[in-house]
């Protein structure tokens, strides 16, 4: 198996990185802070992704998508994770992935085209005692996929009571969602296959968080001096950076394998997806925490940018089950 990117995949990666780098030059994390404090998404970035057709990159062409695969979606999620894009891209593609794999032909024909075009946003929540307490992207969602006891149902946002809630990561909206009694339609297809592909997308965003945290940290410890020398020259700091690199690459390898399996060998996907999500969840939290420590006293301040990565990692790591849950599942699959 070859995990190297094709020319077309590299072009997607280059285009995404260039687009997001241009927006970073225009405002960087300062712009991110503005959107977070205003509790609104970056609508201009959403518009640009719509024009590129990236909301439907992994959806079949007959539903308005680009007909590519999990590898291409993984590339995009990683780049958006690097930039901490304040848009509901991940929640929307998670929901559309579940609808594609678990929905009926009629449900796919009706629900996927507006999600593929970005005309509508979507989100995924886990119900407990009749409500989903933390639905990322719920504030902008037109469509919701709610999971409960191994089943999923899809319903319009109008059939739910949505209340915005505070969240550790304010770069995307979070909501408590309570569906009306009996509302929604069951998704009775391949829900496990959809959930596994959703785990790969989340893991990909976490890899992007790792990569950006490592990049910012290495740049900082090269420039920051104590006693006349860069702090990165001290073994305690350089060893920490080396461990951050190892954690990042371990998560990247596991996630690349899972994305490949989703497209090329679905029988391997359940174990690969659990392994990727577990590895990426732990790596992102550890790497971003190490990044804060490597930045010294300033790393703990609100004015520093590095804390945004830590907050995103904590939230994404918990989505659809954290590392402990994924390892338990992996053990059961062996």
Q: Language-model segments: what does each one mean?
A:
Residues 1-4, 95, 183-184:
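Charged, low-complexity surface segments at secondary-structure and domain boundaries
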Residues 1-83, 106, 118, 196-334:
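Alpha-helical interface subdomain recognition
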Residues 9-11, 92-97, 101, 114, ...:
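Structured catalytic cores of enzymes that bind and process phosphorylated ligands/cofactors
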Residues 75, 79, 94-98, 110:
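Generic beta-strand or strand-like secondary-structure segments
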Residues 83-92:
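Short, flexible active-site-proximal loops enriched in glycine and acidic residues
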Residues 85, 97, 105-219, 229:
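FAD-binding core of flavoproteins
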């Amino acid at each position: 198996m070859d995990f190297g990117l094709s020319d077309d995949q590299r072009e997607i990666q280059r285009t995404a990185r260039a687009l997001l780098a241009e927006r970073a030059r225009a405002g960087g994390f300062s712009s991110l802070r503005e959107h977070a404090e205003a509790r609104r998404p970056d609508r201009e970035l959403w518009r640009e992704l719509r024009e590129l057709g990236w909301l439907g990159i992994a959806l079949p062409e007959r539903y308005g998508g680009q007909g590519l695969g999990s590898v291409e979606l993984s590339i995009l999620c990683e780049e958006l994770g690097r930039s901490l894009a304040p848009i509901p891209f991940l929640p929307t593609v998670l929901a559309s992935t579940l609808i594609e794999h678990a929905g009926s032909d009629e449900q796919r024909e009706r629900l996927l085209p507006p999600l593929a075009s970005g005309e509508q946003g979507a989100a995924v929540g886990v119900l407990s005692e009749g409500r989903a307490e933390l639905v990322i992207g719920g504030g902008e969602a037109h469509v919701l996929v709610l999971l409960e006891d191994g089943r999923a149902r899809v319903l319009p946002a109008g059939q739910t009571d949505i209340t915005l809630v505070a969240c550790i990561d304010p770069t995307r909206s979070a909501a408590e969602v309570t569906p009306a009694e009996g509302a929604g339609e069951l998704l009775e297809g391949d829900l496990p296959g959809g959930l596994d592909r959703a785990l790969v997308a989340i893991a990909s965003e976490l890899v992007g968080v790792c990569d950006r945290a490592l990049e910012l940290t290495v740049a900082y410890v090269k420039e920051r001096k104590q006693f006349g020398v860069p702090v990165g020259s001290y073994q305690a700091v350089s060893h920490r950076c080396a461990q951050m690199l190892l954690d990042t690459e371990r998560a990247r390898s596991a996630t690349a394998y899972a994305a490949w399996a989703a497209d090329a060998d679905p029988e391997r996907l359940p174990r690969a997806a659990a392994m990727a999500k577990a590895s990426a969840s732990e790596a992102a939290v550890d790497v971003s925490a190490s990044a804060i420590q490597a930045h010294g006293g300033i790393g703990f301040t609100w004015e520093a940018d590095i804390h945004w990565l830590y907050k995103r990692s904590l939230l994404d790591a918990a989505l659809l089950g954290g590392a402990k849950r994924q390892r338990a599942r992996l053990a059961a699959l062996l």
